[in-house]
Regions:
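A short alpha/beta connector and helix-capping loop motif
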Residues: 1-16, 81-97, 116
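Short, conserved catalytic/metal-binding motifs centered on acidic residues
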Residues: 29, 55, 71-75, 104, ...
């Protein structure tokens, strides 16, 4: 991860020349009341095959029986194979209304995870994975309860 901010003399742009193009990492996981579950990191942008693999190998086994899975409207979430696998396992899928990140408590968890991972300034793949693991573990049940409470408040209090 590279610095998000820099310094330069007044009136000049801060420029950082990277020696190489950094590897993109994709972090995926789920949340239920009281816990985060099924974390996985890929050293690339996630593909539809990765999404299905995560559903089959990680998510379904981590869910309690007859869970309701609420997803946002990311195109990959509509993958028929993944949706069928979830339904065959006895779970229900619901989709949020479009453009509603304020109603999605996991967005607050992602914010904390990314902030903590960036804050440790990892250099290299091993250190980045360790930073992500530590950040993931830092999301407490109390945090999660707060994220769900905030989501409910956002849903019922119009913003003027």
């Amino acid at each position: 991860m590279h610095p998000r901010y820099g310094y330069a003399p007044k009136g000049q742009r801060a420029v950082v020349k990277l020696k190489s193009r950094p590897t993109r990492y994709t972090l995926i996981g789920a949340m239920r009341i009281g816990s985060m579950l099924a974390p996985r990191v890929w050293p690339r942008a996630m593909t539809a095959d990765d999404w299905v693999r995560w559903i089959l190998e990680d998510l379904i086994s981590a869910l309690k029986p007859r869970s309701i899975i609420i997803m946002d409207n990311l195109n990959i979430h509509y993958n028929g194979y993944a949706l069928d696998a979830i339904k065959e396992a006895g779970h229900t899928v619901l989709f949020q209304s479009r453009y509603s990140p304020d109603f999605n408590p996991i967005e607050m968890a992602w914010s904390k995870i990314k902030t903590l991972a960036r804050g440790s300034r990892p250099r290299g793949a091993k250190l980045l994975r360790a930073a992500i693991t530590d950040a993931w573990s830092a999301v407490t049940p109390r945090d999660i309860d707060g994220y769900f409470s905030q989501t409910i408040e956002n849903a019922w209090q119009p913003k003027c």
